Every structure is written in C-alpha cells, then in structure tokens.
Amino acid sequence: MASKKITYPPPPIITITRPLIAVDWGTTSLRAALILNAKVQEERSSDQGIMSVAPGDFPNVLSQICSQWLDFEDVLILIGGMAGSAQGWQLAPYCPCPVSVHYLANHLHWINPHKIGIVPGLSIEHEHAPDVIRGEEVQVLGALSMLGKNSARLVLPGTHSKWVEVREGVFEDFSTYMTGEFFSILKDHSILSKTLSTSSPLEFNAEAFDKGLDLRLKSKPDRKNTKLEGTGNNQARTANTMRKPNLLHDIFGIRTLALFDRHNPEYLVDVLSGLVIGYELQTQSFRKNEEIIVVGTSALQTYYSHALERLGACPITLGSEATWRGFQVIAQTIDHGIA
C-alpha cells in the first residue's frame, strides 16, 4: 500500500552565500555533499564510519572524501551524526530539549571557528532514563523545511527508530526504539536464524507483514465469554485468537511456524518485520488521518507507511534529501547571523 500523495506549497527558499560541504558521518558509513546556491551539486560516500577511523585520522578522511571541494573559497563544512560522539572526531555535547534551530546553530562545536563545525545531538529526560539523538535532528530540520512546516510528528526508522515531535519550530519530545537492531539480532543471531531466509526479501510481502503486525494489534480476550471448541485433545479456546499480545511468546511463534512448515523462510522474514514494527507502533497513539512524516530508506518507508495506514494515520515519506536540506537550514541560520 503506497503512502498518500499530499500536495504542499513550494518549500521556503534557502539562501546561503557560502559554499557548503555537508557531512553525514555515521558509525559504519560516511556521506558527503557539495552544496552551491542551495543545490546539491555532487554526493560522495564511503564505508569509513567513525568505528573504522583511527584516532587523529578524522581530518585526513574528511580531506579524502571532499578532495577538490575544499578548494572553494570561504567554504563552510558542517558535520552531523556520530562524529560528535565520544567515539568520534571531537565531542559535541548534547543540547537538552526543548531546542530550536537557532539554539542548535548557536551551539555547534567548532573544530575550526566558522569553518568546520559539528552539529550537536539532542537529549531529553524521560521518567525512567534519558534519551538521545545524534544525526536525526538534521533530518528533522530538513523534512520540516521541505514541507514548509514548523510543527509535525515524525518517525525516522532505522537501527534505532526515533519518534520526534516538533512544535512551532522547537524540538519538544522524542523517543528511541531499538527496532532495527532487535530485528537484525533475531534474524541473524538468534535461533530464528536457522529457519529464516538469510537474505532480505526481494519485494515487500504485505500479507506476511500484516500477519506479524496483527500479532501485536490483536485485542485482549474477554475471559468470561471464552468457549471451548472441539473434543478431547483437540479442544481449543476460541479466545486464544484474541489473547493479550506478548513479545517474547510471539517471537517464538515465528520459529514454530517454520518448524511446522506453515510458511517459507522468505515469508517469515516479513512476518518478523511486521511483528517488531507492530510492537513499536503500539507505543504510539494516532488521530484519524493524522499526518506522520516518515524519513528513511525506500524499504523502510514502505514498511512503516503500510503499518501507519493500517492504524488510520496518513504517512508522508521523505528520503536522504532531508539530510542535505537540514544542513542547509543550519547553514542559513548561521549565514544570516540569527543563531
């Protein structure tokens, strides 16, 4: 099921007087873009995430991926993501929420004053534990700018999915779910790995995904009205199909579906996807037709959009272009001296 097409007015024009090099430096990968006159001229990528860069070698890696771009006069380099973590180039302390783009731009960690800056992450205090974001804040700023919004609810699915609420241009709340990492562990490193396909599905299987999703969305049974069907050992409680969902039990069900040859290994990968995403989404509440901005890869957009529509929400999808737009928003804020 495709996400709904909604027409928005053209996004606000970005005005930046300086050449901009935007760098999205993750744990295992590195992406960079040259932006001139608010347009992406060229993109480059490598597998030199922060975990593969030796201490003190970050300047060399940056020079390698940017090469001729550094020759532009008065070029501004903005770096987001894990380069600002304790394991990265230099620590860029978290900014505690609530945070505006102006506050964020005013608290860049400058490696070279007004030449090379690292965008700080965000932190928030929840009742049970603090939560943090590094890198997604740039994507959020870009998504809002592209859609001409200053208030929105967003989900950024990935290894660690982020749910973010922005009101009047201020990051008010966010929460993190280890959905992608949990899925990967179950698929590749648990007992399920013996029965699931080792490769990713070639295409989205909505039927399989819905089967996993429904395991979480089923309602709690009315025990008083439970009836027994069948006779002897074949008796079954009809309410079992409406039992209270339990993650640990449902995960094992993926294995037994394979043991009894109910579905093939490829099918069960999408069942598992639906299951873990369903548990993530059940922590959220949605108004009918509420717009939820989904920022992520094409594959993750498909999974989350389908699930959100099942729950009555209206997903709006954006990809990697939101990252580069977010860096431009920060650069414009710096450029205009309104940080």
Predicted regions, residues:
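Short beta-strand-loop/turn "lid" adjacent to the catalytic site in phosphate-handling enzymes
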Residues: 69-133, 168
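Glycine-rich phosphate-binding/hydrolytic loop that grips phosphoryl groups
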Residues: 275, 316-339
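Active-site rim beta-loop-alpha module in soluble metabolic enzymes
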Residues: 177, 185-223, 227, 232-273
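Short glycine-rich, Thr/Ser-proximal phosphate-binding strand/loop in the N-terminal lobe
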Residues: 20-57
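Glycine-rich phosphate-binding loops at beta-strand->alpha-helix junctions
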Residues: 29, 289-307
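A short acidic Gly-Thr/Ser loop motif
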Residues: 23-29, 155-160, 179, 296-299
